[in-house]
């Protein structure tokens, strides 16, 4: 890997767009998965094959409408001749790594481009933001020291407030675009040799302030995480309190649908198993006196926890899409933390490290 800084030309966004355009023009990739600004002024991940269209690319936009690993799965799971570059945040990369292990993503003809995440806002909050450029500029200023604060009147997504892994990590990342701990007017790049050569990157090292700024950011996020987990564990400590936590669940399955790890088409909740015959409801009511409609809400969440909590990367998409504002992501992260410690497993850390559900250990 080659590391160095590059002076910004015109703006940080234009510089990043230029880097991506160079990768396409030099043939390192001939397609890109990248967030782009839409005519509605919202942002969505787009598949780009025309380098000129990168004028609308906006990987700096602090919004995460979906976890990009879901899109990457659709673009790579079956054979394709195009060389694909995927511009992703850290939580998306970690989800991608997990999906590689479950054979839902293939990296044979793809490379990962990671960008420092300075925090994201809910989709509706970003859409309603007045001066989007001021919001982004404020984050870039805070990134220099790692002291990131939301824009006045706005609030980071709950998952971002307690994300202790905001920077891309791992040798599987072919290009890192660094913003944290980088002087105003520069951008930090860490690239695989062939990518560095295409970009004309000179090896001049890591910015001196990057490690300290990253530590400042991670420390603040870790404190917020620990406080959120402590509050959850104080509130949920028994079966009754767990039932209360999910008492407003309407079993819409939004959390499952938008979770990058819940890919399984054979999931029991996608089958007729829980499409009970009408008479059964009356029999249950006769036995219990009352039956909740729709039933099996807690079973749904417990099944998801059992199946994927060791691979939960904390992206928070489940919380974002819950129509009744259940903090699903906090539940899964708090439970997942203990399960992951138990198996000494860090989801998304390594492509070579098998997920706990993929292997059997006699001492587990």
Regions found by a protein language model. Give the residues of each.
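Iron-sulfur-associated redox domains of electron-transfer enzymes in respiratory
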Residues: 1-242
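Generic structural signal for well-ordered, non-membrane alpha-helical segments
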Residues: 9-16, 252, 315, 328
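Residue-level marker for well-ordered alpha-helical positions
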Residues: 17-18, 243, 253, 306
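A general structural signal for well-ordered secondary-structure junctions
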Residues: 29-30, 106, 255, 318, ...
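Local cysteine-cluster metal-coordination motifs and their immediate loop/turn environment
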Residues: 89-94, 155-168, 247-268, 309-325
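Short amphipathic alpha-helical segments
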Residues: 98-100, 175-176, 261, 271, ...
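Alpha-helix boundary/capping residues
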Residues: 100-103, 249, 338
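Ferredoxin-type iron-sulfur electron-transfer modules in oxidoreductases and energy-metabolism complexes
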Residues: 224-247, 264-364
């Amino acid at each position: 890997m080659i590391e160095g800084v590059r002076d910004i030309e015109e703006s940080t966004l234009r510089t990043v767009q230029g880097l991506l355009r160079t990768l396409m023009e030099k043939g390192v990739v001939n397609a890109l998965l990248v967030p782009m600004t839409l005519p509605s002024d919202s942002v969505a991940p787009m598949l780009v094959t025309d380098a000129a269209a990168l004028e609308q690319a906006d990987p700096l936009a602090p919004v995460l409408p979906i976890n990009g690993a879901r899109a990457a799965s659709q673009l790579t799971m079956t054979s394709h001749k195009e060389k694909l570059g995927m511009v992703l945040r850290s939580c998306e990369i970690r989800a991608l790594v997990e999906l590689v292990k479950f054979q839902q993503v293939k990296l044979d003809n793809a490379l990962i481009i990671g960008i420092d995440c300075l925090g994201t806002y809910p989709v509706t909050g970003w859409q309603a933001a007045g001066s989007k450029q001021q919001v982004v500029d404020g984050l870039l200023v805070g990134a220099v020291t790692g002291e990131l604060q939301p824009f006045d009147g706005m609030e980071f997504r709950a998952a971002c407030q307690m994300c202790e892994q905001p920077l891309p990590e791992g040798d599987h990342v072919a290009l890192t675009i660094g913003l944290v701990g980088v002087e105003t007017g520069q951008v930090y790049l860490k690239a695989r040799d062939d990518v560095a050569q295409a970009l004309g990157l000179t090896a001049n090292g890591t910015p001196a302030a990057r490690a300290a700024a990253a530590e400042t950011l991670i420390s603040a996020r870790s404190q917020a995480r620990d406080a959120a987990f402590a509050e959850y564990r104080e509130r949920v400590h028994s079966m009754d309190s767990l039932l209360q936590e999910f008492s407003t669940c309407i079993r819409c399955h939004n959390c499952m649908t938008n979770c990058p790890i819940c890919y399984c088409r054979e999931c029991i909740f996608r089958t007729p198993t829980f499409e009970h015959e009408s008479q059964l409801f009356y029999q249950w009511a006769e036995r219990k006196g009352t039956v909740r409609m729709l039933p099996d809400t807690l079973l749904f969440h417990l099944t998801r926890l059992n199946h994927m909590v060791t691979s939960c990367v904390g992206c928070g998409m489940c919380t974002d899409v819950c129509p009744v504002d259940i903090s699903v992501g906090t539940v899964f992260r708090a439970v997942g933390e203990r399960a992951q410690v138990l198996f000494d497993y860090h989801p998304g850390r390594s492509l070579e490290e098998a997920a706990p559900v993929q292997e059997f250990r006699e001492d587990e």
